Amino acid sequence: MNGYVPYVIEQSGLSERSYDIYSRLLKDRIVFLGAAIDDQIANSIVAQLLFLEAENPKKDIYLYINSPGGSTSAGFAIYDTMQFVKPSIHTICTGMAASFAAILLLAGTKGKRFALPNSEIMIHQPSGGAQGQASDLAITAKRILGIREKLVTVTSERTGQSPEKVAKDMDRDYFMSAEEALEYGIVDQIITSV
């Protein structure tokens, strides 16, 4: 969300109010993930989800995603919050949902996960690097394998694909069109309008 942020001006009666576009979207219960997932982005998304739940726990939330993915720990903070809050969460891929962003796309409420027609979705196994003594490398490798297993389990449970198929598909970058993501079970529908 770095760079230029547009502002909108709303008029009511004799007064005007200026909002940055993200704050204005939040008024309509729309959250936009449009960057790589790091701790700062995750904390912002989590805060917005918690705010919207506190404001009205019975009203749906809309999470629009256009992201290359990012940190698994930051991603799981968003994922767990999505499962924790009471409102149904519609997920909508606009552009790309890659890596952990694809996990967030499939984390939406079943029946309410969408992709726009030209969206691209990509799943893969986690990656990481380490240096140091052999014992340090073993600890890091064990952690990454554990994260991989969690990602396989979540993807399998939420798509209906077997864990074996998901593990095989995640072995390398596995790109899907919107139609392929629909067949895979990552999204429930391809949409062209609201």
From Swiss-Prot:
Keywords: Cytoplasm, Hydrolase, Protease, Serine protease. One of its GO terms (molecular function) is ATP-dependent peptidase activity. Its EC number is 3.4.21.92. GO terms for cellular component: cytoplasm; endopeptidase Clp complex. Pfam families: CLP_protease (PF00574). Gene3D superfamilies: 2-enoyl-CoA Hydratase, Chain A, domain 1 (3.90.226.10). The active site is at 99 (nucleophile), 124. Transmembrane segments: none annotated. Its main location: cytoplasm. Signal peptide: none annotated. It is found in: Cytoplasm. CDD domains: S14_ClpP_2. One of its GO terms (biological process) is protein quality control for misfolded or incompletely synthesized proteins. It catalyses: Hydrolysis of proteins to small peptides in the presence of ATP and magnesium. alpha-casein is the usual test substrate. In the absence of ATP, only oligopeptides shorter than five residues are hydrolyzed (such as succinyl-Leu-Tyr-|-NHMec, and Leu-Tyr-Leu-|-Tyr-Trp, in which cleavage of the -Tyr-|-Leu- and -Tyr-|-Trp bonds also occurs). Disulfide bonds: none annotated. Fourteen ClpP subunits assemble into 2 heptameric rings which stack back to back to give a disk-like structure with a central cavity, resembling the structure of eukaryotic proteasomes. Cleaves peptides in various proteins in a process that requires ATP hydrolysis. Has a chymotrypsin-like activity. Plays a major role in the degradation of misfolded proteins. Belongs to the peptidase S14 family. This is ATP-dependent Clp protease proteolytic subunit 2. It comes from Halalkalibacterium halodurans (strain ATCC BAA-125 / DSM 18197 / FERM 7344 / JCM 9153 / C-125) (Bacillus halodurans). The lineage of its organism: Bacteria, Bacillati, Bacillota, Bacilli, Bacillales.
